[in-house]
Amino acid sequence: CPSMCKCTPEETILCNRAGLKTLPGEIAASTISLNLSNNYLRILNINTFRNLTFLHSLWLDGNNLTFLTPGTFHALSRLQELHLSRNSRLTYLHANTFRGLLNLISLDLSHCNIFEIHPLLFSHLPSLESLDLASNNMRYVPQAFRNLSSLTRLNLYLNNNQISSISDSAFLYLNKLHFLHLSRNNLSSLP
């Protein structure tokens, strides 16, 4: 167990509020849950999580993340929940940021400064059920959600943005959309 963290017998490592600027090197490959929230992590690359293939839950909220290198999460095919909220310097996400996350159910990107969503950003997430994009700087809702058509249930949070326009086909194939939250935006009409 890394010295600045707490570990449990259930393969959970709690490194929240540990003052980390980089990932501790002593994280066991068998780790199932890793909490790195409220630290000073800035950039994650393709090697950051490569040995943590059993990870189911990952908390990276409240850090100083500025960029997520495409392929960062590629080895995490078992990951079910990913928390990236409150990374206020995170403004852009590459189209392949979430490639490899085949079992991801919940993705929290709220309270970042994301202003644009690439149309293919969520196309690698066939199991996604909950997507939180609340309190960002989005002004436009593109066709990025079209690829989420196979979902059994989707909760989509787009509240507290600056959205004034929504693509006519933004929600076209979301037949299983369960909940859509668009409050506190600049919308004058809906498609």
What residue spans do the PLM features occupy?
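Extracellular/luminal ectodomains of metazoan preproproteins built from arrays
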Residues: 1-11
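LRR N-terminal entry segment and analogous cap-like coil->beta motifs
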Residues: 9-46, 52-56
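Consensus "Asn ladder" position of solenoid repeat domains
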Residues: 18, 39, 63, 87-88, ...
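Tandem-repeat architecture and repeat-register "anchor" residues
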Residues: 26, 47, 71, 96, ...
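Leucine-rich repeat
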Residues: 21, 27-30, 42, 50-54, 66, 74-79, 87, 90-91, ...
